């Protein structure tokens, strides 16, 4: 009986919130240009355009405004309980990020689902959509996120099979299938299955926001990224008023090293996100833009973007995008410029997501080791070990592995600083090999510095230029067109006496940073080398 009262209370609070949100929303500009979506329902004809706008927002992960818009629909037509599907889909959060619904979000979603079951949608198809999303929330508290993701994927696969002519069912099936992709699976099997569904849909619906969006995610891997350029260059024009739609193309631009495109689209995304008070999205876009500018040698612009982002708080969103970007941007600014003393002085900030704290301790430790302060590096290494232990205890395997990659790299540079070159290379190589087996998370444009690139720099310091060049060039396969990689490759080739290859890499460095600040020592060296030939 108590459970029934609780469910009723939650449901009632949802309906009240829906009504309030609808009244508040009456004076808002509801979304703008978001792409074309067709999702027939049995709801009142007057709310159908608003419902489809909410679905378009859902496809572009504009969750806060989509939630308000679905609430607006339900307030205008209380019989339109298929909105429970949309509401519950929003509360699962980004299905590619792996974080899933919060406990509070799961309770709200279940209340909406229960309300839809008490007042069922008028058609079987709509009821099936509600039950498909309900599969994720079933026994929510007693299942790990991976089990929920798999249940969701199977439910939407069944929905798509039952309604083969329902293109929205096919598109959501592809999304949730892509959401089962493991970072450890470098066959990218789930992505390949999603692509097989989405590419025909893209030909059929070139202005559909979800199709372009999910294609980008499904091509977001080193060997696949080139195939994602068509969708990447299309998506921002499909839904230019959605902050995430403006950011998403840069997932592909980063993978292929197209930095100018990444800067442009992320600046637009950050501006639109701040206008919409979507702070996690604004920080996320800013981190990608900072990363891209640093590759172009635009250190001043990177710093300005970071400082602009820091003028705004991250809000109370459970998304890790804010704390990750807040920790990553200053670490990138120091590490990409080789400012080891600056890196060592970065200030750690406590976070509910401990892996974001690890970014700062990693940068501090590398900076301290490379500027000769071994004692400080060892203290920060202890913090990394402690964070790694916490993540393992929480069974957060992916991020525990990422922190272990950082810990091994730090141990390698500490060994290097102590004069134990062989041990340093051994540890740094272990870090690079582990990183290669663990695909980067979508929250980041890239690790603070690629581990294999760090290995190349260590070998170069040890006067092993041939070995260093081998590692730099291997790193380019996964992280192309990076400033520090070209600089390291050029210096390694120069030290080997390979003048032709050195000149080629120095020329790439100069071309890459032709619109940069021009004050990095690596660039001065490159210009001098080219001038003397």
State what each model feature region is.
Residues 81, 88, 92, 103-118, ...:
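TPR/TPR-like (Sel1-like) alpha-helical repeat modules
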Residues 45-53, 79-94, 121-141, 165-183, ...:
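Amphipathic alpha-helical repeat scaffolds of TPR domains
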Residues 75-76, 160-162, 202-204, 233-241, ...:
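Solenoid-like repeat scaffolds
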Residues 57, 91, 135, 177, ...:
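Residue at a conserved register position within TPR or TPR-like alpha-solenoid repeats
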